[in-house]
Regions:
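Alpha/beta-hydrolase superfamily serine-hydrolase fold, recognizing
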Residues: 1-270
Length: 270
């Protein structure tokens, strides 16, 4: 049995002078108890994307289906690279997490189960927030960027076409190519912040991804393991970026949900 879902759209979770209001949409299961919440961070190379557009292979009702399994979902927008440079989008994710904690009682949210979930650029931001002290009891990151400095070489090694120049996605995020601002690139890379204090992390990556190669997830998993943290890594055979080519996207979602339930056994319990 799945729970019916209530939507609360266009909630302003933050306001930064000079910028558009920062908004999220809530998807709430109708439960008689506080429910864990997933802060969902969309991808798009830090320059595109919206809280209203899940990955195409998952369908437009993905957030409703996720919430129907007993999790509240807070799908957030954040400032894109055409609006503001790093660390602006990271600051926005942190602000959204703070909003969830502050407003949990009013929406029936369990602050003992705040999870981050993101894909691609959103996975990068979710990981970075969790690894730099934001409240997170677990992270699901799908095909995330984890090491900005090595992204061009990883793309080349995977048979893709690297773009190390000033118009690249990472240069637009940082304000300059990663090679020109190595200190900032390190600060903006989740792999630089691996520590024993990290929450449990699930990394899932297409084995055939040449846009954000699996080496990015492998490297972070190794760094987290070396630091004594809990990290699980799964490479999906045949899958490229955005789960194109994956034979079982429903299975990928199930694996991700079960990970969160394992991290906090009461999370999303049906």
């Amino acid at each position: 049995m799945t729970a019916p879902v209530r939507r609360v759209p266009d909630v302003v979770y933050g306001e930064v002078p000079g910028y558009r209001p920062l908004e999220l949409d809530l998807y709430l299961p109708r439960e008689d108890r506080p429910v864990p919440v997933i802060v969902l961070v969309h991808g798009g190379g830090w320059r595109h994307g919206s809280r209203r557009h899940p990955l195409p292979v998952l369908g437009a009702d993905f957030y409703d289906r996720l919430a129907a399994q007993g999790f509240a979902v807070a799908a957030i927008d954040y400032r894109l690279s055409g609006e503001a440079r790093f660390p602006a989008p990271l600051d926005d994710v942190r602000t959204a997490i703070g909003w969830v904690g502050e407003h949990a009682a009013g929406y029936g949210l369990d602050t003992g189960g705040i999870f981050l979930w993101g894909d691609s650029a959103g996975g990068h931001l979710a990981l970075l927030a969790a690894l730099t002290g934001a409240t997170a009891h677990g992270v699901v990151a799908w095909f995330p960027v984890t090491d900005l400095a090595r992204l061009p070489s990883d793309v080349a090694d995977a048979g893709g076409v690297p773009d190390p120049g000033p118009g690249s996605r990472e240069a637009l995020l940082l304000g300059a190519p990663a090679s020109s601002v190595p200190g900032l690139a390190r600060e903006a890379s989740p792999v630089s912040h691996a520590s024993a204090a990290a929450p449990p992390v699930l990394l899932m990556h297409g084995a055939a991804d040449d846009l954000v190669p699996p080496a990015q997830s492998i490297r972070l998993a190794e760094a987290l393991h070396a630091a004594g943290a809990t990290a699980e890594l799964e490479l999906v055979p045949g899958a490229t970026h955005m789960w194109n080519g994956a034979s079982d996207t429903d299975g990928i979602v199930r694996r991700s949900v079960e990970f969160l339930r394992t991290v906090t056994p009461q999370a999303g319990a049906r």
